[in-house]
Amino acid sequence: MSISARFGPAGQADNYHGKSSVKYPAWLAERGLDAFEYQCGKGVSVGEETARAVGEAARAHGIQLSLHAPYFINLANPDPESRKKTTGYVLAACQVAEWMGAERVTAHTGALMKRSRREALDIALDT
């Protein structure tokens, strides 16, 4: 088995003074980094055109992409309407990741909400 490591930030670094996510992969490559996790922690708001452009820029500069799904995802929420919204957030994150050509989507699957791990898992599996 071959093990390799890539290094880069999750989100835009504080010392990146540009506003453009599309130009960020070039900035990372100039610093010797080769990975970037695009942050959708507060919601998925990037459009297809921008997502594809970020992906193209990342590939051009040898940057491996991943995407972080919204932080408020909770597959173990007992409320069916909330679980329906959660499913939508996960699918939206996956769609953007596909547009970007990201290797993976990072998602925190939720909180126990005063339930046992088994109860929370059963709810999540039903989602």
Stretch-by-stretch model annotation:
Residues 1-94:
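N-terminal pre-domain/capping segments
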Residues 59, 76-127:
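Active-site acidic/histidine proton-transfer and metal-coordination neighborhood
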